[in-house]
């Protein structure tokens, strides 16, 4: 059994913490603040799809892997706030991260919040020591920034970054949080 961490690539698009949608990229490009859940300190591990594929391939045909369970992860982890800061560096523009409690986002009925509620609002850190021991050839080569760059290039080329001006939920929630004091 191989359990990859959050695997991303050009086909999936560039994730964000609070919702399964991509308008946040356009918001950053326009210089508009973006929401994060809480203070953005929840830890997460990301694995670029090409590295994940190599992990699966290197397990094939290995007697010591039969019947085992492996976490297919990078050794490194990152907070969601730093994930978004890395994305901003790749995009070439820095904006304010505005924290909102998960409960406030649920009350506001933020669309596509399920991934945040079930996974991304929480620390998700898994050990890759077992796969490193049994499959030493597996070591992720693509940095988060390089992977993000490849994903953004594909999304731009395919026109998959939506216009953020048509969505109002994020601006409304940011205004509310700024009024009460964001994280």
Predicted regions and their residues:
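Mid/C-terminal beta-alpha module of Rossmann-like enzyme folds, strongest
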Residues: 58-116, 128, 150, 178-181
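NAD(P)-dependent short-chain dehydrogenase/reductase
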Residues: 1, 5-43, 87-89
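Glycine-rich Rossmann NAD(P)(H)-binding loop
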Residues: 9, 37-42, 70-77, 88-90, ...
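Conserved C-terminal active-site "lid" loop/helix of NAD(P)H-dependent oxidoreductases
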Residues: 49, 106-138, 157-161
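Generic structural signal for alpha-helix termini and adjacent loop/cap motifs
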Residues: 31, 62-63, 134, 154-158
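Residue-level signal for the nucleotide or nucleotide-sugar donor/cofactor binding architecture
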Residues: 47, 75-78, 126, 142
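Substrate-positioning beta->alpha
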Residues: 16-24, 37-60, 67-68, 146
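Amphipathic terminal alpha-helices
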Residues: 142-183
């Amino acid at each position: 059994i191989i359990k990859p961490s959050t695997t991303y690539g050009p086909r999936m698009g560039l994730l964000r913490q609070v919702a399964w949608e991509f308008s946040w990229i356009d918001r950053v490009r326009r210089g508009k603040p973006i929401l994060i859940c809480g203070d953005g300190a929840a830890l997460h591990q990301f694995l670029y799809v090409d590295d994940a594929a190599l992990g699966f391939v290197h397990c094939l045909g290995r007697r010591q892997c039969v019947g085992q369970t492996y976490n297919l992860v990078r050794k490194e982890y990152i907070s969601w706030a730093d994930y978004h800061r890395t994305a901003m560096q790749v995009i070439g523009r820095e904006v304010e991260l505005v924290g909102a409690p998960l409960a406030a986002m649920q009350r506001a009925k933020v669309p596509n919040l399920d991934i945040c509620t079930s996974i991304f609002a929480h620390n998700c850190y898994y050990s890759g020591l077992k796969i490193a021991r049994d499959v030493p050839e597996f070591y992720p080569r693509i940095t988060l920034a390089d992977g993000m760059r490849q994903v953004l290039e594909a999304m731009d080329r395919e026109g998959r970054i939506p216009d953020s001006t048509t969505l109002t939920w994020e601006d409304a929630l940011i205004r509310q949080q700024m009024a009460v004091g964001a994280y």
